[in-house]
Amino acid sequence: MKYIKLLIVFCLVFIPFKVLAVEDEDIISKAVSGILIDAESGKIIYEKNKDDQVAVASMTKMVAQIIILDEIEKGTIKWDDVITVSKNAADMGGSQIYIEEGEKITVEDLMKGISMASGNDAIVQMAEVVSGSEAKFVKRMNKKVKELGLKNTNFVNCTGLDEEGHYSSSYDMAVIARELVMNHPEILKFSSVYEDYLRENTDNKFWLVNTNKVVCKFMFYVIIILGRMM
């Protein structure tokens, strides 16, 4: 079977992504901005308002993942490194994997929580591991998008929580997603999985279900992080 090698970044304004039906025939008209590209060549197949600056929610985390995976590749951090959770990370709101202050957790489990559950607590913890603080990590994220030549992206946080001055475009997100998949295909071992567990062999087992419901139905697609752009 020939695998589909298309990377889809679609920006929805009228339909919250968590309740979007895959079969919705009106998905294109309800998207305020969107793009479809070939992940290998980068060729644009379809676009709608691709350069409009919009809020990108959890798709923000793709840039963070690139930076984290770069550090793993360099050996600065390792998959099996055990991290002690900070109060700052544990107190994060929004989507979470519910890590607790002082808890011990591996880099691999944090990345699993980021990729599958879009955990804000997990990404902030990894930002602190890599750069010492979220603020310093965000500076590195903005440096990365400039290196990629992106002109319609600026980050204020690493979570994607809505803040003034935090935005991107569907084109920029597609470039970021392509960079992630092509240079770090290992991310797919997390993002293409529909369900898994954290702390599986403990009394505090936590069930992870991928926030991207497309994973359950279309396993041939390159799946990254699904967010809602406004």
Residue spans for each PLM region:
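Domain-terminus/edge residues, biased toward the C-terminal soluble/receptor-binding domains
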Residues: 1, 150-154, 162-167, 171-230
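A generic short-segment signal for beta-strand/edge and adjacent turn/coil regions
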Residues: 3, 52-55, 81-83, 92-94, ...
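Sec-dependent N-terminal signal peptides of Gram-positive bacterial secreted proteins and lipoproteins
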Residues: 3-21
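Active-site-adjacent loops and short helices of periplasmic peptidoglycan-processing enzymes
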Residues: 21-171, 178-182
